[in-house]
Amino acid sequence: MLSGLPGSGKSTLARRMSDHTGAILLRIDVFEQDLRNANGDTFDVGTQGYQIGYDLARHHLLKGKDVIADAVNAVEPARTGWRAIAEETGTQIIEIEVVCTNEDEAAQRLRTRETGIDGLLPVMPQDRRKRIWEPNSLSSGTVDTAGRPISDCVDDLLRLVKQTG
């Protein structure tokens, strides 16, 4: 499970990890935007995007596939959902926080990124700063992407997964 604020680099890392390992990538932004596309831009997705992610994770894990959950996971209830799926399916969960400690760099990423998701509006830098973030006492580690090549960050992520798994 990769957690982090918008602009931290978690989706980029999740894609690279999926490409490297063959794990199924579950990106909550996709599910949430699909719900908005189907129900209108003002539709309040609430926790429904996460519920879709949990259901898909369960499905793939029961088939013996590895899964990468790419979501903000800013609060404990979101993380608890992923943990419950891991417990239910008898699989291990590895929780890693992705951060960008350089706020200017994170803001630049948000201003210039291509989401690859039809209809998804960009997160504004000021909205990133307003986000609630609850510390995760069960995190296996943190990858700071600030000022670093993505390949180095992927290497750090792979090391954390190997150490924990």
Model-inferred region functions:
Residues 2:
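Hydrophobic anchor at the beta1->P-loop junction of P-loop NTPases
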Residues 8, 12-65:
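Conserved substrate/cofactor phosphate-moiety recognition/catalytic segment
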Residues 48-93:
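Glycine-rich phosphate-binding loop used to anchor ATP phosphates in small-molecule kinases
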Residues 89-110:
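Conserved phosphate-donor/acceptor-positioning beta-strand/loop module used by diverse small-molecule
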Residues 115-156, 163-165:
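Small-molecule kinase domains that catalyze NTP-dependent phosphoryl transfer to phosphate-bearing small molecules
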Residues 5:
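P-loop (Walker A) phosphate-binding loop of NTP-binding proteins
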Residues 30-32, 99-105, 149:
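Conserved nucleotide-binding/hydrolysis micro-motifs of P-loop NTPases
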